């Protein structure tokens, strides 16, 4: 019995000390999650207008979860929506959640508060340039 308890405690200690089940903290170049709504909105607007200045940077942002599926292509898009301080205007950044996830099974309800950390990039689709945080780590309710 004692041997079983000791073995179990060793396994738990080993799991905790090696980080099993814990997302690794990654260095962040631009952390917008702690800034006021107006400052974040302004910064995201700047990212929209001058995306080349941010390419390849790791960005963290807090906002609300949004989802869209193109009715023609059936392609799914996931975004974090950031409102300004007055909540009259909003900007969104698409994200690609690292790993395998299915909507709606692995996602919370729309507009759930979230924090997204990912590599900033852009892509072209149908003649438009879109912002995207790729290889994103997602925390719900934070």
Residue ranges and their predicted role:
Residues 1-4:
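Positively charged n-region of N-terminal signal peptides that target proteins for export
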Residues 6-7, 133:
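Intrinsically disordered, low-complexity regions enriched in Ser/Pro/Gly/Gln/His and often acidic
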Residues 8-17:
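Bacterial N-terminal signal peptides
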Residues 17-142:
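OB-fold and OB-like single-stranded nucleic-acid-recognition modules
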């Amino acid at each position: 019995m004692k041997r079983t308890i000791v073995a179990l405690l060793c396994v738990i200690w080993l799991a905790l000390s090696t980080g099993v089940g814990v997302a690794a903290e990654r260095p962040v170049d631009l952390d917008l999650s702690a800034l006021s709504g107006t400052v974040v909105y302004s910064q995201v607007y700047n990212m929209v207008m001058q995306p080349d200045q941010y390419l390849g940077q790791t960005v963290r942002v807090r906002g609300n979860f949004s989802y869209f599926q193109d009715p023609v292509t059936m392609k799914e898009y996931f975004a974090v929506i950031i409102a300004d301080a007055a909540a009259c205007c909003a900007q969104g950044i698409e994200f690609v959640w690292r790993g395998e996830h299915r909507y709606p099974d692995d996602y919370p309800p729309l507009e759930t508060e979230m924090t997204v950390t990912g590599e900033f990039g852009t892509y072209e689709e149908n003649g438009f340039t879109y912002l995207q945080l790729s290889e994103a780590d997602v925390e719900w309710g934070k």
